[in-house]
């Protein structure tokens, strides 16, 4: 059981190649047994709340009763376009979680066939990128609203938001193409399982995957999120100094706290995943060969995957609330 750590049978995004000699470290079997018993229940819980939250967000934005709720404005605003796309992305994302939970609970013996192996893994991978890129787009939109409020309105920006969302979905699909093409179910005789794994045809693919996942999927988006939110905080701080007599302090403090919550949520949910994904790259290129670190990387990836998936539950709550608060704050500056 523990030797599947060497296989790195992550269901969503990791590349795996079964080594000829399968070994395990002392104490690893117990750790994997505990993970396979406990983790599926947590994943199903995340799936339930993720489905509920994102369906509620989409129903508010898109269903006909929204017209009764907000009669004066039937078209989606810029923020709502991004939030609706984020909810749709997270909804598709969490639909793949039951397959992942079953895979882990079944001790990584994939029971759904090769087609679902490729489709589920590819869809999860695509929406990993789509969700992160949309978070960047939301941060950029709020940056423009609060730092340059007088130039941030109009139909032209609405069309730009729609085009931006379309490009983000296309980019997510393109970045997940290797997963769609190279995922398959392979028999692992040593473990007596048929595993859904990603086998790269050449060692160079490991470096490509690291750049794609860690750089394009985390470091660059993180830099953009930090840049936009730093300037938002600086703008709010300046507005607070200029408008003390208008009782703007509490609202500014609430907005600043929300911004810090957004950034902290992104880091807490995604940083562990990308840290262990980078360790996995070092294992694949044989920079790390110690048994302990290999086992730690494999177990860490499974747990970090879970924290990344939790983000799909937090997004509806955080970003919809953030959208309403930011809209109120921007209208107050005009």
Swiss-Prot record:
Q: What are the transmembrane regions?
A: 42-62, 81-101, 119-139, 162-182, 215-235, 259-279, 303-323
Q: Which residues lie on this side of the membrane: Extracellular?
A: 1-41, 102-118, 183-214, 280-302
Tissue spec? Expressed in heart, liver and lung.
Q: Would you tell me the Gene Ontology cellular component terms?
A: plasma membrane
Which residues are tagged as glycosylated in the record? 13, 21, 192
Q: Which domain of life is it from?
A: Eukaryota
| InterPro entries the record matches | Brdyknn_1_rcpt, Brdyknn_rcpt, CCR1-9-like, GPCR_Rhodpsn, GPCR_Rhodpsn_7TM
- List the subcellular locations: Cell membrane
Q: List the disulfide bonds.
A: 117-196
Record-linked Gene3D superfamilies: Rhodopsin 7-helix transmembrane proteins
User: How does the protein associate with the membrane?
Assistant: Multi-pass membrane protein
Induction per the UniProt record: By lipopolysaccharide (LPS) in heart, liver and lung five hours after treatment.
Task: Fetch the PROSITE patterns from UniProt.
Answer: G_PROTEIN_RECEP_F1_2 (PS50262)
Compositional bias per record (Low complexity), positions renumbered to this chain: 10-21
UniProt topological domain (Cytoplasmic) ranges: 63-80, 140-161, 236-258, 324-334
For the biological process aspect of GO, one term held by this record is: response to lipopolysaccharide
Sorted UniProt keywords: Cell membrane, Disulfide bond, G-protein coupled receptor, Glycoprotein, Membrane, Receptor, Transducer, Transmembrane, Transmembrane helix
Family per record: Belongs to the G-protein coupled receptor 1 family. Bradykinin receptor subfamily. BDKRB1 sub-subfamily.
Q: Which function does this protein serve?
A: This is a receptor for bradykinin. Could be a factor in chronic pain and inflammation.
Annotated protein name in UniProt: B1 bradykinin receptor
């Amino acid at each position: 059981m523990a030797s599947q750590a060497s296989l790195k049978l992550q269901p969503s995004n990791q590349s795996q190649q079964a080594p000829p000699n399968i070994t395990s470290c002392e104490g690893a079997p117990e750790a994997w047994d505990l993970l396979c018993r406990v983790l599926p229940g947590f994943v199903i819980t995340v799936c339930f709340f993720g489905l509920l939250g994102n369906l509620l967000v989409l129903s508010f934005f898109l269903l006909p009763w929204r017209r009764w709720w907000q009669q004066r404005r039937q078209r989606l605003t810029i923020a709502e376009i991004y939030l609706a796309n984020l909810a749709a992305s997270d909804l598709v994302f969490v639909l793949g979680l039951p397959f992942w939970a079953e895979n882990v609970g079944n001790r990584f013996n994939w029971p759904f066939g090769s087609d679902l192996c490729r489709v589920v893994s590819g869809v999860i991978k695509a929406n990993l990128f789509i969700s992160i890129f949309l978070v960047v787009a939301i941060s950029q939109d709020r940056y423009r609203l609060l730092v340059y409020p007088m130039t941030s309105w109009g139909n032209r920006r609405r069309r730009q938001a729609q085009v931006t969302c379309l490009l983000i979905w296309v980019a997510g699909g393109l970045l997940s193409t290797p997963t769609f093409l190279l995922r398959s179910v392979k028999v692992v005789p040593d473990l007596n399982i048929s595993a859904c794994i990603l086998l790269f045809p050449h060692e160079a693919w490991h470096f490509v995957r690291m750049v794609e996942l860690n750089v394009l999927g985390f470091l660059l988006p993180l830099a953009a999120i930090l840049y936009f939110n730093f300037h938002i905080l600086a703008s709010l701080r300046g507005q607070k100094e200029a408008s003390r007599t208008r009782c703007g302090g509490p609202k500014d403090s609430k907005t600043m706290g929300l911004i810090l919550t957004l950034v902290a949520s992104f880091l807490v949910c995604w940083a562990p995943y990308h840290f262990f994904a980078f360790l996995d790259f070092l294992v694949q290129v044989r920079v790390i060969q110690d048994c302990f670190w290999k086992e730690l990387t494999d177990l860490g990836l499974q747990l970090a995957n879970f924290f990344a998936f939790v983000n799909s539950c937090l997004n509806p709550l955080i970003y919809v609330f953030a959208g309403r608060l930011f809209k109120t704050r921007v209208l107050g500056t005009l």
